[in-house]
Amino acid sequence: MKTITLNNHNYELIENYKNAYDDQEVQNRFTDYFEPYDYVVGDIAYSSLRLKGFYDTKNKKAKKINDYKNLEEYLKTNCAVDCKYFVLKKID
């Protein structure tokens, strides 16, 4: 898997459905808001990238809305049908 550095943190690209990951696009959208999250998911609809942070289930900050175990539900209910998406996992 590919390792990516964003705001001095390392992430591993663990899923890249339909080749959704675009380094330049992510660099432009990623802010310090996403730094506390264990995972960052990007989905593309109408040619626009949207990012959302998720916590690992073991993280005390995890709630139903941002628990990584609910990723499939998020993709089905909040994203365009069969949209391109990627998942970054924080590794440091």
Task: Give the positions of each predicted feature.
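N-terminal leader/targeting segments and the first structural element of proteins
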Residues: 1-45
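Compositionally biased, intrinsically disordered or flexible polar/acidic segments
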Residues: 8-17, 59-62, 85, 91-92
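N-terminal interaction modules that seed assembly of large macromolecular complexes
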Residues: 35, 42-59
